[in-house]
Design a protein with these regions (language model features):
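A conserved ligand/cofactor-binding region detector
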Residues: 1-810
Length: 810
């Protein structure tokens, strides 16, 4: 070890000891792993804070144009390891922790995941923040500081149970409370006309208090900001009620306001839950817009140049009410005339759509919006009036066209269409894969595209290689470093250099040893969390994502049962041992998804305890899936299941993370699977099933799922076993309604239509896995082809084509 490195390591060790004494308040020789995590985090926080302040000063002095990224969720995961890597302090911290006989990875494991998101939407936002900082974009993320996240998942008797995720109960070293940054956010009341203007009267008020988290760039001194809002009641408690013994009433007003920032996506199956969701969306959007305008006016004397200095991006429709809120602020508070305000608004906003399913496009009842946001509803009506007048000139005498375009759905209960508001109020709208973006303008947004064909574009998603390869898979990263050098972390296209090594027996041996080590780690985690012992020498077949019918976890289960029945029928055949791994959460009110989780456990209980099967087949469900769990699963996967019905998955990013770690994909021609196939080669991916045009044609011609049940004996046997209670003997009809729905016309996502192709393709997977050298060659080819799927590339495209922001190199 060099003298300079010793000096640095010694300095970091001294800082750790100092923070144990001064910040954590423990004697160094009595420090627990949690104490050490807190102390090391403070060492990193100190360095990041210096860079952060310098970044803000530089951007303020340069009066840089900034992107403001509004997202309901940011699934950040843990921060410590990422921060130490960004600061190039990982080795120094590891050496410093050696004084306490502890490893850096064990210390980092004591940090809870930040419960600020749920699925792909939030993880994409987190990857984007990482890339914005790394490529040097002046940027600001805005969201909500959820105290309890969405929920932590537990499994009881095979059923998902939800409980709060109190990730903040011991505080977090990564946030900076901003006591001086608080904004009022109003709800309710009514609108009156006074002096020719609309005035919002008698609204209730909650305070939005700012908490900042730092987002370090890699290979740069830049540190960006994620500002999160906490809801604070205007008065803490009703002291009079408290003093009379009415303790519930004393706290009721406080809870009514502050529950806005308690939980991500509260159950919306009740009127109160729906109202709370709308309040959440407006709460963070209003505070964020007030904040960005206040910052702008500190740097510029006028709002006339707002669109030149700020690009506001809507990550899906949750922040779409921001279009009406910016108009309210400009017109009502800044006295800007309507046409000028609207022109400014449209130049400022851009919008990413994340779904192709019409039923998933967010809408709000007009009556609810009238109750919660009466002024905004009035503004939306005015925006709609002017937009429809313009649209009528584009296509005269076509009322059906105007009805589809309208911001208000007049069929049945009147509802505000938030996607339509986002499109009308933005200058650019993007999808997140080439197929998705094409389908947007061909299907759900075709009418808008006929008016504004240039408004729509594509930005294929990406993932940050710093977390999903360098951090999640350190052994593979070391192999890449010794083969390619270290700069692939900032230029993922360099992975193409692996193509020259994919047939190299020595390189393959190293690659396969690393894969097995990661599988051993994953197997230990499965035994610890799911209580099931699995063999790392079996194929690890992985489907980890939100549980949803369109993602077709149920199709995967049908294949598992098919395989189980085949093993029992042909026990002496040379079966490829396989461990099928599921993980993911079902929304608390989504009963079908919860039934799928229960079925996975019921099927697993039978298969895993059948001595006739042994290690030939195991089925496991890993509970409480999140970023840190994914960092264990992704490196250990052999096969990546990406099996959504073609035309339903906008992009997917789990497919990218798994391929980046050397898993082969079995999937439909959907979302980003198509682009993965184009980049890794047709021979290095397993594609099955109907393509999007075939799905559409079959649906239009009249899809009869019973035909497949009647004509495919293996499928009939599987469905009969499920419906007949083979996997639920304590309640034989538990899954009868599920099977009846599949056969009787409820198979909307065409599981039965794709079943035969899926099962046949799984046999091809087995055939390849029997030849380890060929499998390894294709796994390496997958890693080599993943350069284009860096979120750095995605963000550079956003910056160039949508936000028009130049990187600020530090």
């Amino acid at each position: 070890m060099s003298q300079s490195l010793m000096n640095t390591s010694t300095h970091v060790a001294a800082q750790i000891e100092e923070h144990l004494l001064k910040t954590v308040g423990v004697l160094p020789n009595e420090a627990t792993l949690t104490n050490l995590m807190q102390a090391v985090s403070q060492v990193a926080r100190e360095q990041l804070s210096r860079r952060w302040v310098a970044t803000q000063a530089r951007e303020k002095a340069a009066k840089s144009r900034r992107v403001v990224y509004l997202s309901m969720e940011f699934l950040m995961g843990r921060t410590l390891s990422n921060a130490m890597a960004a600061l190039n302090m990982t080795d120094d911290a590891s050496n410093g922790l050696a004084n306490y006989a502890q490893k850096m990875e064990d210390v980092a494991d004591r940090e809870p995941d930040a419960a600020l998101g749920n699925g792909g939407l939030g993880r994409l936002a987190a990857c984007f923040l990482d890339s914005m900082a790394t490529v040097g974009l002046p940027s600001f993320g805005y969201g909500i500081r959820y105290e309890y996240g969405m929920f932590a998942q537990d499994i009881q008797a095979g059923c998902q149970t939800e409980y709060p995720d109190p990730w903040l109960q011991n505080g977090t070293p990564w946030e900076f409370p901003r006591a001086d940054i608080t904004y009022p956010v109003r709800f309710g009341g009514w609108v009156e006309r006074a002096n020719g203007k609309s005035v919002w009267r008698n609204a209730g008020e909650v305070a939005a208090k700012a908490y900042d988290m730092v987002i370090p760039g890699h290979g740069t001194e830049k540190v960006s900001t994620l500002r999160l809002w906490k809801a604070v009641a205007p008065a803490h408690i009703d002291l009079n009620a408290f003093n009379t013994g009415d303790y519930a009433r004393a706290a009721s007003a406080k809870n009514e306001y502050e529950n806005i920032s308690w939980v991500l996506y509260p159950n919306d199956s009740t009127p109160a839950g729906r109202e709370l969701r709308l309040k959440q969306e407006y709460f963070f959007v209003s505070a964020s817009i007030q904040d960005l305008i206040a910052r702008h006016l500190k740097e510029h004397p006028t709002l006339a140049n707002l669109a030149d200095k700020v690009a506001i991006h809507l990550n899906d429709t949750h922040p779409a009410i921001g279009v009406a809120e910016l108009m309210r602020v400009l017109c009502d508070e800044q006295n800007m005339v309507w046409d000028e305000a609207w022109a400014l608004c449209c130049k400022t906003f851009s919008y990413t759509n994340h779904t192709l399913m019409p039923e998933a496009l967010e809408t709000w009842p007009v009556a609810l919006m009238q109750h919660v946001l009466p002024r905004h509803l009035e503004l939306i009506f005015q925006i709609n009036k002017e937009f429809l007048e313009m649209a009528a000139r584009h296509r005269p005498n076509d009322n059906a066209f105007l009805s589809r375009l309208s911001l208000i759905d007049e069929h049945g209960e009147r509802r505000v269409r938030m996607a339509n508001l986002s499109i009308v109020g933005s200058h650019k709208v993007n999808g997140v894969s080439a197929l998705h973006s094409d389908l947007l303008v061909q299907t759900i947004f075709a009418d808008f595209a006929s008016i504004w064909p240039d408004r729509f574009t594509n930005m294929t998603n990406g993932v940050t290689p710093r977390r999903w390869l360098a951090q999640a898979n350190p052994e593979l990263s070391s192999l890449l470093d010794s083969t390619l050098g270290q700069s692939w972390r900032l230029n993922l296209d360099q992975l193409q250099g692996l193509n020259s090594r994919k047939s190299d027996a020595v390189f393959q041996k190293s690659f396969m040893e690393i894969k097995r080590n990661n599988k051993v780690r994953l197997a230990a985690y499965i035994e610890r969390t799911a209580g099931i012992k699995v063999s790392p020498d079996s194929m690890f077949d992985v489907q980890v994502k939100r549980i949803h019918e369109y993602k077709r976890q149920l199709l995967n289960v049908l294949h598992v049962i098919t395989r189980y029945q085949a093993i029992l029928a042909n026990p002496d055949e040379a079966w490829v041992p396989r461990t099928v791994i599921f993980a993911g959460k079902a929304a608390s009110s989504y009963h079908t998804a919860k039934s799928i989780i229960r079925l996975i456990h019921d099927v697993g209980s039978v298969i895993n305890n059948d001595p006739r099967v042994g290690d030939k087949l195991k089925l496991v469900f890993i509970p409480n899936y999140g970023v840190s769990v994914a960092e264990i699963i992704m490196p250990g996967a052999d096969l990546s299941e990406q099996i959504s019905t073609a035309g339903t998955e906008a992009s997917g990013t789990g497919n990218m993370k798994l391929a980046l770690n050397g898993a082969l994909t079995i999937g439909t021609d959907d979302g980003a699977n198509i682009e993965i196939r184009q980049n890794v080669g047709d021979d290095n991916i397993f594609i099955f099933g109907l393509k999007t045009p075939e799905v559409q044609a079959l649906r239009q011609s009249g899809y009869i799922s019973r035909h497949y049940y009647d004509s495919l004996p293996a499928l009939k046997s599987v469905l009969d076993a499920v419906a007949g209670g083979q996997f639920s003997p304590d309640e034989p009809n538990r899954y009868g309604p599920m099977v009846d729905s599949l056969i009787g016309g409820g198979d909307h996502y065409m599981l039965l239509a794709d079943y035969a192709s899926y099962v046949e393709t799984q046999l091809r997977v087995d055939d390849l896995y029997r030849t380890p050298a060929k499998w390894c060659e294709r796994a390496i080819a997958n890693v080599a082809g993943m350069g284009v799927f860096s979120s750095d590339r995605t963000i550079r495209e956003y910056a160039r084509q949508i936000w028009h922001i130049e990187p600020d190199t530090l």
